[in-house]
UniProtKB/Swiss-Prot annotation:
This is NAD(P)H-dependent FMN reductase C4B3.06c. GO terms for molecular function: FMN binding; FMN reductase (NADH) activity; FMN reductase (NADPH) activity; FMN reductase [NAD(P)H] activity; NAD(P)H dehydrogenase (quinone) activity. Signal peptide: none annotated. Has several reductase activities that are NAD(P)H-dependent and involve FMN as a cofactor. May be involved in ferric iron assimilation. It catalyses: FMNH2 + NADP(+) = FMN + NADPH + 2 H(+); FMNH2 + NAD(+) = FMN + NADH + 2 H(+). The lineage of its organism: Eukaryota, Fungi, Dikarya, Ascomycota, Taphrinomycotina. It is found in: Cytoplasm; Nucleus. It comes from Schizosaccharomyces pombe (strain 972 / ATCC 24843).
């Protein structure tokens, strides 16, 4: 491999975006574990993103995101847009709420448009029944944002007492999901290989 080829082989930067901002939540622990597994499986760079650090209003932008960054008027929107634009791909780690995914995650998605386009996405849900419904909804929305979603969407199941207590050891609780997660990260990595502009 020549030096120019090596320079082009840049390690993708992946944002692990947490879907929950509840005070008593499992999301940070699970997202950290998922990110660490992703690093082992793909050797990409993973950064955890907590939406509590990104207070985005529901309705303070006069323009539509599809019109581009020139319509952004709020500093928090500009900062969020810059954060997402600087990433090469995403992992969403989210609980399922009442058959769907959290409003905070929907708001974060809807604040932007072009910044999401064409980028690989891996969806990991969790809950008493695994969160398959919320994952399906996220996949649908991601399609409208022109993201490229890994086919396998791990749905991590948790017993009710773990959810209520807000304490979990993913390495113990999710052993049965390891095969599915490894498969999903394999598909996620292949999405970069199939995109000539974003090779690992």
């Amino acid at each position: 491999m020549t030096l120019p080829e090596k320079l082009l082989k840049i390690t993708p930067k992946i944002l692990v975006i947490m879907g929950s901002v509840r005070s008593k939540r499992l999301c940070p622990t699970i997202a950290t574990w998922v990110g660490e597994m992703g690093k082992r499986e793909t050797n990409f760079d993973y950064e955890k993103v907590d939406l509590t650090d990104w207070p985005l209003s529901m309705s303070d932008e006069p323009g539509l995101p599809i019109m581009g960054i020139d319509v952004y008027t709020q500093e928090h929107t500009k900062a969020w847009g810059s954060k997402i634009a600087g990433a090469d791909g995403f992992v969403f780690v989210t609980p399922q709420y009442n058959g769907g995914y959290p409003a905070i995650l929907k708001n974060a998605l809807d604040h932007l448009y072009h910044e999401w386009n064409g980028k690989p996405l891996l969806i990991v849900s969790y809950g008493g029944h695994g969160g398959g419904d919320c994952a399906s909804q996220l996949k649908h929305v991601a399609g409208f944002l022109k993201m490229r979603v890994a086919p396998t969407m791990p749905a991590l199941t948790l017993p009710r007492d773990k959810i209520v207590q807000g304490v979990v050891d993913p390495a113990v609780e999710f052993t049965k999901h390891l095969g599915e997660l490894k498969k999903a990260f394999g598909e996620f990595s292949q999405l970069f290989e199939s995109n000539p502009e974003r090779k690992p």
